[in-house]
UniProtKB/Swiss-Prot annotation:
Feature: compositional bias, Pro residues: 712-722
UniProt gene name: pnp
Domain S1 motif: residue ranges: 631-699
UniProt-annotated binding residues for Mg(2+): D495, D501
Cofactor entry: Mg(2+)
Protein known as: Polyribonucleotide nucleotidyltransferase
InterPro entries according to UniProt: ExoRNase_PH_dom1 (IPR001247), ExoRNase_PH_dom2 (IPR015847), ExoRNase_PH_dom2_sf (IPR036345), KH_dom (IPR004087), KH_dom_type_1 (IPR004088), KH_dom_type_1_sf (IPR036612), NA-bd_OB-fold (IPR012340), PNPase (IPR012162)
Function statement: Involved in mRNA degradation. Catalyzes the phosphorolysis of single-stranded polyribonucleotides processively in the 3'- to 5'-direction.
NCBIfam families per UniProt: polynuc_phos (TIGR03591), PRK11824.1 (NF008805)
Domain KH, chain residue ranges per copy: 562-621
Enzyme Commission code(s) on record: 2.7.7.8
Top-rank taxon: Bacteria
Database matches in PROSITE patterns: KH_TYPE_1, S1
Keyword Metal-binding assigned: yes
Amino acid sequence: MQGQTKSVSFDGREIKLTTGRFAPQAGGSVMIECGDTSVLVTATKSSGREGVDFLPLMCDYEERLYAAGRIPGSFMRREGRPPERATLISRLIDRPMRPLFPGWMRDDIQIVATCLSLDERVPADVLAVTGASMATLMAGIPFQGPMAAVRVGLLGDDFVLNPSYREIERGDLDLVVAGTPDGVVMVEAGANQLSEQDVIEAIDFGYEAITELINAQKEVLKESGIKQEMPKAPEIDDTISTYLDKNCTKSISEVLKNFDQTKEERDNKIEEIKISISAKIDGLKDDNAVKKSLSLNNKLLENSYKALTKKLMREQIIKEGKRVDGRELNEVRAIDADAAVLPNRVHGSALFQRGLTQVLSTATLGTPSDAQEMDDLNPNTDKTYIHHYNFPPYSVGETRPMRTPGRREVGHGALAERALIPVLPAKDTFPYVLRVVSEVLSSNGSTSMASVCGSTLALMDAGVPLKAPVGGAAMGLIKEGKEVRILTDIQGIEDFLGDMDFKVAGTEKGITALQMDMKITGLPIETIGEAINQALPARTHILGKMLDAIETPKDNLSPHAPRLLSFRIDPELIGTVIGPGGRTIKGITERTNTKIDIEDGGIVTIASHDGAAAEEAQRIIEGLTRKVHEGEIFPGSITRIIPIGAFVEILPGKEGMIHISQLSEARVEKVEDVVKVGDQVTVRVREIDNRGRINLTLRGVSQNGGMSNYPEPTPTPVAPLT
């Protein structure tokens, strides 16, 4: 079971593609490896199902914790529901693959990528995307590939190909680009306010590298004796489409050119035309070719009518430069933005509306212990900024069961989250964990970018000192032959009937996130650059409208938000603060009614709704961690008495003991003869033993009162002379 292995030298690393060895019953399989990262990707096709009028493509990325030498933390010690990271990588595979299958395909296709070994220097996601293309080609599935993906980072002024996790964290760019010989089909990126030109150059840099991986796949196919052939598309009966073209073109065009109507009015009129033509067909004789054609496929009318509407809308944009709502190609819809739309029990809130797209965003401030722990293969184990995106059915006037968030919700939330990360305050100056929730109240395109805008406003309303506000817009594209038109701020119908959805988010300074999906087999870098540059004035306009709602972050937090104190202690003294079995820190939290978090590096964060209580907890911890030296004198309070001495709290939470022999210059029979609990005394540190215990003394130390019965020294009796 050796199989065939093709090695590609790729930017100083070796990428291996092994076929014919693993998963022999899958339609096609490849083990793609780089360093110690290994991903098995399979592609399998089954025959289509009756009545399906779309491509039922399933892309799944599976993580196994054994890949990193770990055992799952669940009760059953087994991987459970896919983590968010796996969902995002599944989408990353799906997005460049889907447009490369022929439009007529209706067979079930499943691509499964399983990470079997993970090298922290080599992320698995881009390998999985490239492997998906190779496995599909090996399976002989009709596919307009090969396709490959790479990651591009930016360290200083230099682009880095397929950077490690550490390099991604240190760099100013994390960009994934996927492409075919025809051009770029997918882009996903997070950036630290980079200029448009820098991002365009990064995409170009990545696309050039893709060529090597595309050629390697072609060589594997050749060595395996597999010929890549695209079957002819099934013949489509054009009787219905010809009939609709003749009978509906004029009426649909009139609706699309009426710019004074609302979306609802336009949709209703287009639906009325369809109902009318359907009734007209029903009235035809049974032997009429149109009626006979429709009787063989009852979905033919619906599909042909959609295709005609799509064609007419696209022609109007290409030939007349006018969109269905009357906007120019580079025009943004009307914007309305408000901050503090909910009572201040919600720490921050905002309502952002662009056209018929409306999003309510809320911001909540939490303590470090509220960070989200990530039980996946990502080396970063927790998240301190979380964005959740909700898309209820009423937002598009529909009814359906309310279930857990799907892949789309997870993906949109992650994009909006990524857009804000570069402008969040540093952890050491603003140690809060932040959660933003974006509720889509109405959707007509670009809800993810509306969530970016709403998130910014909600965080500013919550008093989060953002480095800069972030806004975003979705760009679209219509391509007919050599004619290309780029659309700014696309609405729902333009997204559905167009060729591209390109979301660009950023500040006035530069881009923080972008995501491009295509419905065609590739786009040249020049066109992508044009779209990115056209998004800049739109973003500037949107940011201006946002700043009209709230110009700067609020100076004060909501009275219902926790107050945090953050300071650093010696990491070696963390155990002292925690105490045996956590007793010390538990005692502090109960005494002060606070919440305390301590990081491994010694950063202590105290949370409380009462500022004085937080300061008291800080005073206690600083007392516990303050080093005491022999000879120092402290005022203190007697806390407890034992037969051989008394304990004194000399610093908050730190006690020392006065041995009975150190209570007085004179002999003391009982400790209670000198001191009692609650007495205020002044003590000197006599010694600190090898176990760190503090031994105190009262001898030779001036007292300022407060002791119960401090005896004066008496002379030692002298034995009589004999």
